[in-house]
Design a protein with these regions (language model features):
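Short, Lys/Arg-enriched N-terminal segments with co-localized hydrophobic residues
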Residues: 2-23
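N-terminal catalytic or cofactor-binding beta/alpha core of small enzyme domains
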Residues: 20, 31-259, 268-273, 367, ...
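Solvent-exposed loop/turn segments at secondary-structure junctions
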Residues: 180-183, 231-235, 266-271, 298-301, ...
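A short, glycine/acidic-enriched catalytic loop
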Residues: 193-198, 269-304
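Extracytoplasmic/secreted envelope proteins and their assembly/folding machinery
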Residues: 211-215, 242-249, 311-314, 318, ...
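Alpha-helical scaffolding within the catalytic cores
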Residues: 248, 273-281, 332-338
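Active-site-adjacent substrate-binding region
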Residues: 306-333
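Active-site-adjacent mobile loop/cap segments within catalytic or ligand-binding domains
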Residues: 327-381
Length: 381
């Protein structure tokens, strides 16, 4: 009887080793497995609440796994964010059916720091008549020569000795650049980098780009204009005017129809303490670099017998700019300078802003220059 009971009730407890295995299995089922399950569940819940959990949803989507990131920096949204641009909702088995899976928002742009201790001062020059600045209508001329006031004023707004034809088949205007590599501030902040030279051989960033806008707009307005994009100041700055003189002479020989030669530059205005001046004015809601015409005078040694005719043209051009766009200009600088202005009676140098302006401000100004030139030429018809 006892032997039978032992055989039927304890068939699996035949050895001590088998008895130990049984006890371990029982312990795993009753205690260890539930404890581990609870631990993993609590760990996941805690990390999800903090917002730092990253896990793979392969169990939810056996077709394609994506990583789900809880972003505590972003405003609350029901839309999950995934670190892939691919949208997996095309798959009908996708558990995110009905959601829009978006790429994570890019991090906020780090604002560049330009506080180098080298400041830029914004200034709008307002013209006013005084002992050396003369006014006729809306034309202002700053006379720093020894030529009398009455003699200078008598030239202002007199008729030019040339007319620019509209809709001509032949070039009437030449836009060129003696200092073509002059460029502008490469950021909008009111500090400048003293290591940055404001010179650039890239024609999309230097004076060639400003001249191109003037050229294109004048052609649109019916005035046949050509542009020379030679970098006369590169690789050598010295001798720039000698080289640009040769260029202009070649164009005049090839196109004797040219009446106006405009040498487009930018200025460089800086105070003794190192502060750079940014001459700017807001016109039609846009910031524009203020401009200044330089008309040269002969001191007896510059070989400019017709310099007063250039001044006449400058005064008409200035008058148009100020009539159309008040405060757009600084007074014409009338000084003993040559700048190859002896080559035609319509030769002028124009400064479009300064090295503290931005390229965008210069481009905005270029459009107004073109409209003003067209207005000046329209008055000659």
């Amino acid at each position: 009887m006892c032997n039978f009971f032992t055989i039927t009730v304890s068939p699996y407890l035949h050895t001590d080793k088998e008895t130990e295995v049984y006890r371990l299995k029982k312990l795993w089922i009753l205690f260890i497995f539930p404890a581990l399950s609870a631990f993993f569940l609590l760990t996941f819940w805690e990390k999800a609440a903090v917002g730092t959990a990253k896990f793979t949803l392969s169990a939810m989507n056996p077709i394609k796994a994506v990583k789900y990131v809880i972003n505590t920096d972003a405003p609350f949204s029901d839309t999950p964010v995934v670190n892939s641009e691919q949208n997996y909702t095309d798959n009908p088995t996708n558990p995110f059916e009905g959601f829009t899976l978006a790429s994570p928002s890019p991090p906020p742009l780090k604002q560049p720091v330009y506080d180098t201790g080298c400041p830029i001062a914004v200034m709008t020059y307002v013209s006013a008549a005084d002992d050396i600045t003369y006014k006729k209508q809306n034309c202002y001329v700053k006379n720093v020569t020894k030529i009398s006031r009455s003699e200078v004023e008598s030239e202002l707004l007199q008729e030019t000795d040339f007319k620019v034809k509209k809709n001509s088949d032949e070039p009437q205007i030449l836009i060129m650049h003696t200092h073509a590599t002059e460029s502008y501030q490469n950021h909008p902040e009111l500090y400048y980098d003293p290591e940055y030279t404001c010179r650039d051989t890239d024609v999309t960033k230097n004076m060639v780009s400003v001249g191109k806008i003037i050229t294109d707009k004048l052609n649109d307005l019916g005035y046949n204009t050509i542009q020379d994009a030679t970098l006369h100041d590169y690789p050598n700055y010295n001798g720039s005017y000698d080289r640009s003189k040769v260029t202009v002479e070649k164009y005049l020989a090839q196109y004797p129809s040219i009446k106006v030669v405009l040498d487009v530059h930018r200025d460089a205005i800086e105070r003794s303490d190192g502060t750079r001046i940014k001459p700017v004015v807001t016109i039609n809601g846009k910031d524009c670099a203020q401009v200044m015409i330089i008309s040269g005078a002969d001191n007896g040694y510059l070989n400019m017998p017709d310099f007063k005719k250039n001044l006449r043209f400058a005064s008409h051009f200035q008058n148009s700019m100020e009539s159309l766009y008040p405060t757009f200009t600084r007074p014409i600088l009338f000084d003993y300078r040559n700048y190859n202005q002896q080559l035609t009676t319509g030769s002028l140098l124009i400064e479009v802003g300064g090295h503290a302006n931005t390229l965008e401000e210069a481009h905005n100004a270029a459009k107004l220059i073109a409209y003003s030139l067209a207005d000046t030429f329209d008055g000659m018809q």
